[in-house]
Curated annotation (Swiss-Prot):
The active site is at residue 93. Catalyzes the formation of 6,7-dimethyl-8-ribityllumazine by condensation of 5-amino-6-(D-ribitylamino)uracil with 3,4-dihydroxy-2-butanone 4-phosphate. This is the penultimate step in the biosynthesis of riboflavin. HAMAP family: Lumazine_synth (MF_00178). This is 6,7-dimethyl-8-ribityllumazine synthase. The gene is ribH. The lineage of its organism: Bacteria, Bacillati, Cyanobacteriota, Cyanophyceae, Synechococcales. InterPro entries: LS (IPR034964), LS/RS (IPR002180), LS/RS_sf (IPR036467). (2S)-2-hydroxy-3-oxobutyl phosphate binds at residues 90-91, 132. It is an enzyme of class 2 (transferase). PANTHER family: 6,7-DIMETHYL-8-RIBITYLLUMAZINE SYNTHASE, 6,7-DIMETHYL-8-RIBITYLLUMAZINE SYNTHASE DMRL SYNTHASE LUMAZINE SYNTHASE. 5-amino-6-(D-ribitylamino)uracil binds at residues 23, 61-63, 85-87, 118. Belongs to the DMRL synthase family. Disulfide bonds: none annotated.
Amino acid sequence: MTTFEGRFTDTADLRIAVVVARFNDLVTSKLLSGCLDCLSRHGIDTAETSSQLDVAWVPGSFELPIVAQNLAQSGRYQVVITLGAVIRGDTPHFDVVVAEASKGIATVARESGVPVIFGVLTTDTMQQALERAGIKSNLGWSYGLQALEMGSLMAALAQS
């Protein structure tokens, strides 16, 4: 029996794209900071001149899938991370955006064969979003870690 697992130290050949929603950027910028901190601490060059990392900003979480698809299909990246924050309001808009973003991101991963990390917070309040983006913990770090694991796992599967 063969066991396949991603390793968090196999980062030398990893190229990652991060797509960040500008809407609720008070939250998403903190998620991005946590994500970049994780990637940097695990050996990914996160400098502005990095050849391992690119960041694309989109207007909101609804736009994440199309840009993630473009990046995943480019052949330049082993992993794409999507970061967004959708906070419930008084209208059904929340449900529409969350459903379409999650379905779209999952479809990109399935159709491209490139792991796409779903880093979209879905919360009832801004306070809950901020707690998940740095006040209590920063899920951006977790999304970075997921990307490293999936990139390494996909490389291991390709070599088997």
